Swiss-Prot record:
It catalyses: RNA(n+1) + phosphate = RNA(n) + a ribonucleoside 5'-diphosphate. Its cofactor is Mg(2+). It comes from Pelotomaculum thermopropionicum (strain DSM 13744 / JCM 10971 / SI). Keywords: Cytoplasm, Magnesium, Metal-binding, Nucleotidyltransferase, RNA-binding, Transferase. The gene is pnp. It comes from the Bacteria. This is Polyribonucleotide nucleotidyltransferase. SUPFAM superfamilies: Eukaryotic type KH-domain (KH-domain type I), Nucleic acid-binding proteins, Ribonuclease PH domain 2-like, Ribosomal protein S5 domain 2-like. Mg(2+) binds at D497, D503. The keyword Nucleotidyltransferase applies. The lineage of its organism: Bacteria, Bacillati, Bacillota, Clostridia, Eubacteriales. Coiled coil: none annotated.
Amino acid sequence: MADRSILTREIIVGGRPMILETGRLANQASGAVFVRYGDTAVLVTATVAPTVRAGIDFFPLTVDYEERFYAVGKIPGGFIKRESRPSEKAILSGRLIDRPIRPLFPKEMRNEVQVIATILSVDQDNAPEIAAMVGASAALHISEIPLKFPIGGVIVGRVDGRFVINPVLAQAEKSDMHLVVAGTKDAVMMVEAGAKEVPEEVILEAISFGHETVKEIVAFIERYREEALEMGLAKEKMVIEVAEPDPVLVEAVTGPATEKLDGVLRRCVNERLSKQERDSLLNNIKDELMQKFLADYPEQESLIKDLLDSIEKKLVRRMITEEGLRIDGRALNEVRPISVEVGVLPRPHGSGLFTRGQTQILSVVTLGTVSEEQILDGLGVEESKRFMHHYNFPPYSTGETRPLRSPGRREIGHGALAERALAAVIPGEEEFPYTIRIVSEALESNGSTSMGSVCGSTLALMDAGVPISAPVAGVAMGLIKEGDNFTVLTDIQGFEDHLGDMDFKVAGTAKGITALQMDIKIPGITREVFEKALAQAYEGRMHILNKMLEVLPAPRPELSPHAPRIIHITIDPDKIRDVIGPGGKVIKKIVEETGAEIDIEDDGRVFIAAVDQEKGRKAQEIIETLTKEVQTGEIYTGRVTRITDFGCFVEIIPGVLGMQGKEGLVHISQLAHHRVNRVEDVVKEGDVILVKVTGYDSQGRLKLSKKEATPPPESTAMKEGRAHRPSRRRESAR
């Protein structure tokens, strides 16, 4: 360790120092950077395989985000007591790093690259995912891996109308947006946001604001590499060899293939063929061309296939940019035909079927109790989540077969995006004390199933009677960029996503944006593109919202008869033990008697859930009886339970579920306004009488008075009045 060179440099980000260090840790990796941001510490390594992975036609990049519970001083729960599969947060953070760097590698690269971000220490004010993103960029930049440009990334919040870079926890809780911006020094590469109905122009300003800090981070990383090179801590970039295709073959294929494919593509446009019809037609013509060219070039199958795909891509892009023609015949800003249905399933609490072109989503809502909230056991602040959205993408949605496995990164990412889009309109617990779970099933997929899930989920929520503050819709925007010219497409389908340069998903209400996610395949986009895309997305979103509201203009006024009815009451926290009882005996009796489900919070909030509302009311009455406070000075109607020589015991709050109620003693002197010799002369066991609470004795027992609860007879009152009048004899004696 002593003879190792170590490079440590610091940059101020969001008013706090971010420190990068290399040379001390993980020196066998291609590049390794230790990032310290406050008390958050992340080790990011980048490693490349020395040889090309054979038999693939894509870039094999993997980004792993590894959480360690020791980072927050915790031991993992469960029997095994060690970290296992990555959490949802870890998967989303890995995707957050992957998306801005992937377009910056040479498109010909086939060497495996693995980036691993290991979270070593976490405070709650400095986001580890941002430290990991900056660390990944720096580790790649000092390595031999040929990343074209380094990137930077920040979170932009808005507190009291002012933008904040990388807000701390207290600021984040007040912010109306959580926007992640990543990019190079020249352009934005990735945007992801959750927001509370923020207008488009504010989002644009936030992106520009964040990009200014991103530029500073990129310049810092570039200087860091220069210093690392001087110290022998950085490596010269590897060269990716690109085999030039045989020009004779290219010429032989290009002319005939262009003519044939152009004719087929124009037929697709003119006849507005479906996805299956178009794919079949294109595959047949490609197979025909392939057989023709293979006869002359039998060893060039892979190259011929690449040439045909390239020609197809160029033709489609040219038709869009030069002629304004889309493959399905739509206008550039036209949304596919929309079909909307609600209440399609009889037993679930709410359901919506949203179809847009050949993309179809079935969203289903389930309402549960507070105890069914999801407990988030991760590296952040311990909390629970009462609103969840899950997304499923079965193989039949694209007419394919494949093994069914647990949700992958794509499913988790799509589910989280739709969840962010809807979170801003979900009612608070005080207004709607339910746990809400939505599952969106992608029944058909031809582009933007995540935005279809937003629309389907909104319909399902309204069908379930959830009082959302506003309906939400989403649309995916595309981009075709040729030189300085660009064309923005509304509601892209799968074919356009595959051949285009951008997938920009925008969700929101009529008032503003609730979620954004942008992925691109080119080295960044400009503010002009953002402005055009957001303006066009607003038009598309409003069109979709209007179609949805034609079917169901507002949330249903009543819940489904199959949904639990939840009653919310608040009791004195000191009375919780009375409801629970020794060993849970009392609350178990209440549940057995009523069939209701009862959740009690430490602050005294009680949630009573029952499908039968009468059973819920019965449980409420029992709990209110158990926790009812006896007020001194108040008059109660009670039943005489026992008689003794010195008085009688009166139950003023009846017992429930066979348990004793609240009773007190009426002393013999407090039974009547006249002298009482025998208690039985005034009351008998079982009598119902009025009593007044006069206080508590030294042992905390209730003291009651029948005398003070009833007016005295007139004759007694007169006697008592004379008895209290001072005598003349005493007066004269004074």
